[in-house]
From Swiss-Prot:
The lineage of its organism: Bacteria, Pseudomonadati, Pseudomonadota, Gammaproteobacteria, Enterobacterales. One of its GO terms (cellular component) is cytosol. Keywords: Cytoplasm, Ribosome biogenesis. Pfam families: DUF150_C, RimP_N. Gene3D superfamilies: Ribosome maturation factor RimP, C-terminal domain, RimP-like superfamily, N-terminal. GO terms for biological process: ribosomal small subunit assembly; translation. Coiled coil: none annotated. It is found in: Cytoplasm. This is Ribosome maturation factor RimP. InterPro entries: Ribosome_maturation_RimP, RimP_C, RimP_C_sf, RimP_N, RimP_N_sf. Its main location: cytoplasm. Belongs to the RimP family. Required for maturation of 30S ribosomal subunits.
Length: 150
């Protein structure tokens, strides 16, 4: 998670939770048209009205705090079936599930890994890949998503 994403998470967690939702994570994607993507969840699931409510709340906070200096589009959504993973708690919660990882720095000459989350120990996760346990530092994970099975 980038410094900006950490700052945004700290700034937006309380307003999102005040509406009764969990702030799952934040992604800021820089580009010609930058995007601030906010993932929310609740025990009852998420619908379009929930996303609109959070979008209005987040917009109000962002207008006051103004932490992003470039133009951007705001997207609020549920994590979906291919839920992104942002924290050690997410990996712990989904132990036993399949995850796809993209690493910042290669491990064994690979940046992309897919396997079953076996364990979480502090800032390290163990993933079983093709029958072998591999250990990754959370700080080295650039992107992680659950792999849905239909």
């Amino acid at each position: 998670m980038s410094t900006l994403e950490q700052k945004l998470t700290e700034m937006l967690t309380a307003p999102v939770e005040a509406l009764g939702f969990e702030l799952v994570g934040i992604e800021f994607i820089r580009g010609r048209t930058s995007t601030l993507r906010i993932y929310i969840d609740s025990e009852d699931g998420i619908n379009v009205d929930d996303c609109a409510d959070v979008s209005h709340q987040v917009s109000a906070v962002m207008d006051v705090e103004d932490p992003i200096t470039v133009a951007y589009n705001l997207e609020v959504s549920s994590p979906g079936l291919d839920r992104p993973m942002f924290t050690a708690e997410h990996y712990q919660r989904f132990t036993g599930e399949e995850v796809a990882l993209v690493l910042r720095m290669a491990v064994q000459n690979r940046r992309k890994w897919q396997g079953i989350i076996k364990a979480v120990d502090g800032e390290m996760i163990t993933v079983t890949v093709e029958g072998k346990d591999e250990v990754f530092a959370l700080s080295n994970i650039q992107k992680a998503n659950l792999v849905p099975h239909f």
